[in-house]
Swiss-Prot record:
Sites where the protein binds NAD(+): 282-287
Compartment(s) of residence: Mitochondrion matrix
One GO-annotated biological process of the protein: proline catabolic process to glutamate
Protein name: Delta-1-pyrroline-5-carboxylate dehydrogenase 12A1, mitochondrial
CDD domains, sorted: ALDH_F12_P5CDH
Species this chain originates from: Arabidopsis thaliana (Mouse-ear cress)
Top-level enzyme category: oxidoreductase
PANTHER family, per database record: ALPHA-AMINOADIPIC SEMIALDEHYDE DEHYDROGENASE, DELTA-1-PYRROLINE-5-CARBOXYLATE DEHYDROGENASE 12A1, MITOCHONDRIAL
E.C. number(s) listed in UniProt: 1.2.1.88
């Protein structure tokens, strides 16, 4: 039944014509068959019409006798077979990475025409994603494997396209811009260059099946690296289709390998291939293990328990409530930037903010996927966490806290109403055990709400200081003194400040990444690409001439 609901939601919007949705959806369904690179039909993908996902290595698509059969997150039907490489099939991937030298596939001194090639590939790929039928294809495919509203899925495609547009033409070679400094004598100059790592690996999660892997993959390629890409198998069909689009747009077949495997197999490849750099986006637990396994040759964008502080100046309550709802519950809370804790100044507590949050949360429905399956926590696990929180003195359930009604979501996933639990700030900070419980990240539609009085800002800042992940944050205030105090005493790498502050969004036009950790990665901007996918190399030219009358000096 819910596959029907989802299909209706998928058809409900069109990127190109919101005024005639029925006609547009019918047309796009027919046009899917003319998408030149596609090997699946997102509209038909179901238990009755399953798909198979392949890996790609050394310029060829390959299958496997080892299949991971995925269940439809909406109804439990087996609907995708992922041909996963097992430990006996890793050697081609290890060999492929080993064929790339440390100095990369291109650098400022080697094959510089490839900078132009990738500007052209970006141009063509951006053009493809600007075609309504292609954009709709990816939005609907995202919805099938990581159920979210059409607007959220289409937004992911839009950000991906804008990123590609940002690196068209000469913009790729501009990433490799060098600088020169005059030397100590005639004929000497020092030049600083951005240098690739060579063989690299990329491991990305399920929640943004297109945006995260594509932006990191292209950043790695722009700087001259040869990447091996692994996307969570639950959603890897999206990036498999994107790989086919990139090949159609001129991506050299030997430049990228793409693998479907379990974590154990991928870990084996990492240890044997010894990549010069790995980008990992995902859980903190896996991130710390990989940091040890790879001896620090890693960049991380791991989990974030992200917070929002509402300042003393109350205004635009409806807007702030709406943004809080979006930050906490869009994509069913499955964003690494999702609002996990809301600090409410006592002035806001005098407004109908919480009641408005409850009303907004109750608007979310499974039928349009504004609330949907949670892919990494079961319903039981989330409810158990809620019950543990409610044992804290003074805590209470603000809204939610129940399993979704009338759903067919398989039990391996979660199905929870948007939920908020209030915990007094004094109790949060009472002891380490309570603090760890309250700040446990639940990757789902779940948030903690607390209140602070005007003289309790130091308690808020203490709570922020004790957090171990520092990805996104929001300080909702137009009071410059308050903003200065909170921003100056916090760390989060992507912090939104002001009345319209949010924790989510992650567009392509600004840095997105954690702070406070030398291993922290960024995504999307020239600065992020250069930081993650290149290192500094200094070349000192010293041509002479040797000074006239030079004589052999004494030993020193």
């Amino acid at each position: 039944m819910y596959r029907v609901f989802a299909s209706r939601a998928l058809r409900a919007k069109s990127l190109c014509d919101k005024s005639s949705t029925s006609l547009a959806s019918l047309t796009l369904s027919r046009l899917n068959h003319s998408i030149p690179f596609a090997t699946v039909d997102a509209e038909e993908l179901s238990g009755a019409h399953p798909a198979e996902v392949q890996s790609f290595v050394q310029g060829k698509w390959i299958g496997s006798s080892n299949h991971n059969t995925l269940l439809d997150p909406l109804n439990g039907e087996p609907f995708i077979k992922v041909a996963e490489v097992d430990e006996s099939g890793t050697q081609p991937f290890v060999d492929s990475l080993s064929q790339c030298p440390k100095h990369g596939l291109h650098n400022p001194f080697k094959s510089p025409e490839r900078y132009l090639l990738y500007g052209d590939i970006s141009t063509k790929a951006a053009h493809m994603l600007a075609l309504p039928k292609v954009a709709d294809f990816f939005a609907r495919l995202i919805q099938r494997v990581a159920p979210k509203s059409y607007q959220q899925a289409a937004g992911e495609v839009f950000v991906t396209r804008k990123f590609l547009e940002n690196f068209c033409g000469d913009q790729v070679r501009f990433l490799a811009r060098s600088f020169a400094i005059p030397g100590n004598h005639l004929g000497q100059q020092s030049h600083g260059y951005r240098w690739p790592y060579g063989p690299v690996t990329i491991v990305t999660p399920f929640n943004f099946p297109l945006e995260i892997p594509l932006l990191q993959l292209m950043g790695a390629l722009y700087m001259g690296n040869k990447p091996l890409l692994k996307v969570d198998s639950k959603v890897s069909i999206v990036m498999e289709q994107m790989m086919r689009l990139l090949h159609y747009c001129g991506l050299p077949a030997e430049d990228v390998d793409f693998i479907n495997s379990d974590g154990k197999t991928m870990n084996k490849i990492l240890l044997e291939a010894n990549p010069r750099m790995t980008l990992f986006t995902g859980s903190s637990r896996v991130a710390e293990k990989l940091a040890l396994d790879l001896k620090g040759r890693i960049r991380l964008e791991d989990a974030g328990f992200d917070w929002k502080v509402l300042g003393p100046d109350v205004q635009e309550v409806d807007y702030v409530a709406w943004q809080c709802d979006q930050d906490a519950y869009a994509c069913s809370g499955q964003k690494c930037s999702a609002q996990s804790m809301l600090f409410v100044h006592e002035n806001w507590s005098k407004t109908p903010l919480v009641s408005k949050l409850k009303e907004l949360a109750e608007r979310r429905k499974l039928e349009d996927l504004t609330i949907g399956p949670v892919l990494t926590f079961t319903t039981e696990a989330m409810l158990e966490h809620m019950e543990n929180l409610l044992q804290i003195p003074g805590s209470k359930l603000l809204f939610g806290g129940k399993e979704l009604k009338n759903h067919s979501i398989p039990s391996i996933y979660g199905a929870l109403e948007p939920t908020a639990v209030y915990v007094p700030i004094e109790e949060i900070l009472k002891d380490n055990k309570t603090y760890e419980l309250v700040t446990k990240e639940i990757f789902g539609p779940f948030q903690i709400v607390t209140e602070y009085k005007k003289d309790q800002l130091p308690l808020v800042l203490e709570a922020l200081e004790r957090m171990h992940a520092h990805l996104t944050a929001a300080v909702v205030s137009n009071d410059p003194i308050f903003l200065q105090e909170v921003i100056g005493n916090s760390v989060n790498g992507t912090t939104y400040a002001g009345l319209r502050g949010r924790t989510t969004g992650a567009p392509q036009n600004h840095w997105f990444g954690p702070a406070g950790d030398p291993r922290g990665a960024g995504i999307g901007t020239p600065e992020a690409i250069k930081l993650v996918w290149s290192c500094h190399r200094e070349v000192i030219y010293d041509y002479g001439p040797v000074p006239q009358g030079w004589e052999l000096p004494p030993s020193t």
